[in-house]
Amino acid sequence: MQFDSLPLPPSSSHDTTSVPPLKRHAACDECRKRKLKCSGEATGCSRCLKQSLPCHYSLQKPMGRPPKKRPREDNDASVYEITDNGMWADIDDGGILTEEAGAEATAASDALRLCPPVYTAPMRMPQAFPNLLSTDDSHNHLWQLESGRSLDPIPATTGPWPDFSSVTAATSSPFTLPSSLTLIDSPSVSSPSSDGGNSSQCTCLSYLYLCLSHLSSLAPFPISQHTLCSLFIAAKTARAVIRCEVCPTSFALGMQNVMFTGTLLNVIADAWLRVSQADAEELGKLAAPPAYVASVTQNSPNPAEAWKDWLRQTVRSAITGGPADPAGQVKCSDSPTLLSLIEEMEARQHRWHRTRTVESPNEPGSCSPVSHEDHREEDMLCFRVIRSARDVIAKFEFAPHEYPEGVVPV
């Protein structure tokens, strides 16, 4: 390893070698922080420009080991006032100290090298797939699942979902699927065999896991039209998984279906709550149809209030199915409402318990057929998970008239 020699004072230095220019990182700070591929334009990378994020290329730190036991010129207290970006800079740039102060500063600098301070910062979720946030042209807004059809194996797509056709693409996700879940073989409803079993695997768990992973990867980014489209697609995925006919044939599959679907419904509810608190005008100009944007800009006496009303209608339509102006509907908004998914899952759990199709031990509080008279069905784990999603809907504070006719307000 090569070490740089200590710099000499300008008056006594005879080295005529020019100082090498400072180099900047090839990727911007935002892409490096999320571990994404950066396009590297000096004026701003494509991802930062698309997400309206500050694009800054920080300087590379000098390579090599810092010089040891370099005397300092400042007082003792400044030894401990070191920032995380320049931990060794103060030590390198110091001058000559007195003998006593130099010994104390040297001891402190050695202690910092042996036990450097730990700096905490909010954890950012790394973006596993660079094409999750694509433009409107590449979004597959017409993606939908037929009501009577089971989930097929995940195909390659150019839509808002990444390519999960290969194992390497799926394993680059920021989460690691527990080994206990990957070892469970679940049959499919497509082609039952002669012995009563099914030949292929059920893909519900894969869809749920990838859907949750995708939604979590959007959390660090500002709310945009891509967020709304992802939430609508997630609702379609939840509906297809709720209607799966394979999961109730096994207790393990049924429990995974209940827990992951309940988690997905809670994540969708929390995400819509975050959308409702976003800047209505900024989001509306990104997500609403161009004709509606022009109409609000030109004809509305108070555009700010008009955009707030549009955002309220959009969120209400996605949560409860309440009335909304068709002219301002977002693309791919033809998805089931969150409240309808909760009600459908509750009805499914009642049906599972009543028909006793899930084979499970009769444990109190488990998602199993009601076998003990002293345990209420509402206290079972599956209903408690669903109830937590209802609690999030209550935070929207929708008035009774904002619910469709025949829907019980939350």
From Swiss-Prot:
Ordered alphabetically, the record's keywords are: DNA-binding, Nucleus, Transcription, Transcription regulation, Virulence, Zinc
Please name the GO terms that the record assigns under molecular function.
Answer: DNA binding; DNA-binding transcription factor activity, RNA polymerase II-specific; zinc ion binding
Annotated region described as Disordered, given as residue ranges: 1-24, 353-372
Gene knockout outcome: Leads to high sensitivity to allyl alcohol, a compound indicative for potential defects in carbon catabolite repression (CCR), but does not affect growth in non-stress conditions, nor in the presence of 2-deoxyglucose (2DG), an additional indicator for defects in CCR. Also leads to sensitivity to acrolein, menadione and t-butyl hydroperoxide. Abolishes the production of gliotoxin (GT) and accumulates bisdethiobis(methylthio)-gliotoxin (BmGT). Leads to reduced expression of gliZ, gliT, gliF and gtmA in GT-inducing conditions.
User: Would the keyword Nucleus turn up in this protein's UniProt record?
Assistant: yes
One Pfam family name is Zn_clus
Task: Give the protein name, as stated in the record.
Answer: Transcription factor rglT
Annotated source species: Aspergillus fumigatus (strain ATCC MYA-4609 / CBS 101355 / FGSC A1100 / Af293) (Neosartorya fumigata)
Which gene produces this protein? Answer: rglT
